[in-house]
Amino acid sequence: MPDEFTVTPWEVKGKVDYDKLIVQFGTQKITEELKQRIKNLAGDLHVMLRRNVFFSHRDLDLVLNDYEKSKGFFLYTGRAPSLGMHIGHLIPFIFTKWLQEKFNANLYIEITDDEKYMRNPEFTLDQTRSWAYDNILDIIAVGFNPDKTFIFQDTEYIRNMYPITVKIAKKLTFSEVRATFGLDASSNIGLIFYPALQIAPTMFEKKRCLIPAGIDQDPYWRLQRDIAESLGYYKAAQIHSKFLPPLTGPEGKMSSSNPETAIYLVDDPKTVERKIMKYAFSGGQPTIELHRKYGGNPEIDVPFQWLYYFFEEDDNRIKEIEEEYRSGKMLTGELKQILIDKLNNFLEEHRRRREEAKELVHVFKYDGKLAKQMWEKIHE
C-alpha cells in the first residue's frame, strides 16, 4: 500500500509523491525538452532546475514563446510576513532572482500584511507591519535588481490597486473563494475579499505573469486563471517547487511554528551546528561499523537533501558526496559537518547583505525606477 500524503495551501503531510501530485493538480511536468529551451535562452540552468527542485508548471512553455517573440513577461511572488524567515522561505526568492537576472524581467513582490493580520486573531496590524519590514530586509538581501523590482505592502498600496481589485472581486463568488481558501461561516469578511487582492498583481502589466512558488500554492491561482481572460489579461503561469524537507525527516515541509524543523536566517553558527547535529534526520546506520559495511541512504538523509537542493551547486561534488555516503566511506557526522559549514557561510553572507538592505528599502518600495512608475499608476 503506497504511503498517503496531503498537499493543500494550509497543510503538507506525509512523504509527497510529486509525480502523483502533478496528476492530482493537473499541472505539467518540466520536461528535459523544456529545460533545454530555458538553457538556450538563459545561457545556463539554475541548480534547482538541473536537479528538479522546480519540477512542475502551468503555461511555462507559453511564457518562453512570448520571450522568444520579444513580448517578454513579468514575475510575481510574495510573502505573508512572519516573526522570522527560515531557509525554506528563501527557495522561491533565490530562484526568482535568477529568473529576473537571466530574462531581464520586472518583478512584483506583494507583502500581505493585511491577510496575515486578518487570518490570525491574536495579531495586531502594527505587528504584521513590523514583521513586514524585517522580512523585506531578508528579501532584498537575496540580491534583486532595485530598478526592476517593486516591493509593496497591501496596506500601503491599496489605493493604487483598488480599481482592478474591485473588478476581480466582482468575478469571484463566495462559494469559489470559500472552497479554494478553506473559509467557513466563521471567517471574517476581510478574508473573503482578500483573494481579489492577491490576484491583482497578476494584472499589473499586459504581459504574461510567471509565479515561482511551492506546489502547495497552486490552488490559489486557479481562480485567477478562471477569470483573467474575461478581464482582458493572461492566465497566470506558474513554476512549482518541491518542499525543502524539515530537519526532522523527509515528510512534510518546514514549519515556522516548530523551530526544531527549520534553520532560521537569524540562527548563529552554534545554533546551526546544534540543530543539524541534534535534529537533522540521518539516512545512516546506527553504528559506525554498520555504516562502513552497509552505507547510508541519501534519499532519506536530510543533510544530503539540503545539499542536493541548493547548498552544493557543483554537480560533480554532489555526486562524489552521494557515492561516498552510499558506500559507507563518508560517515553521518562528516556529511552533517559539510552542511553546517555551507549553511554558516551562506547565513554569514546573508546577514551582511541584510545590513546593507536597510539602505535600500526605500529604493525597492518607493524610489527605484519601477517603484516610481508603480506609485504613479492606478490599476484599472
Swiss-Prot record:
Its EC number is 6.1.1.2. GO terms for biological process: tryptophanyl-tRNA aminoacylation. A motif ('KMSKS' region) lies at residues 253-257. It is an enzyme of class 6 (ligase). Signal peptide: none annotated. It is found in: Cytoplasm. GO terms for molecular function: ATP binding; tryptophan-tRNA ligase activity. Its main location: cytoplasm. It catalyses: tRNA(Trp) + L-tryptophan + ATP = L-tryptophyl-tRNA(Trp) + AMP + diphosphate + H(+). One of its GO terms (cellular component) is cytoplasm. A motif ('HIGH' region) lies at residues 81-89. Keywords: Aminoacyl-tRNA synthetase, ATP-binding, Cytoplasm, Ligase, Nucleotide-binding, Protein biosynthesis. Pfam families: tRNA-synt_1b. Belongs to the class-I aminoacyl-tRNA synthetase family. HAMAP family: Trp_tRNA_synth_A (MF_00140_A). This is Tryptophan--tRNA ligase. It comes from Saccharolobus solfataricus (strain ATCC 35092 / DSM 1617 / JCM 11322 / P2). The gene is trpS.
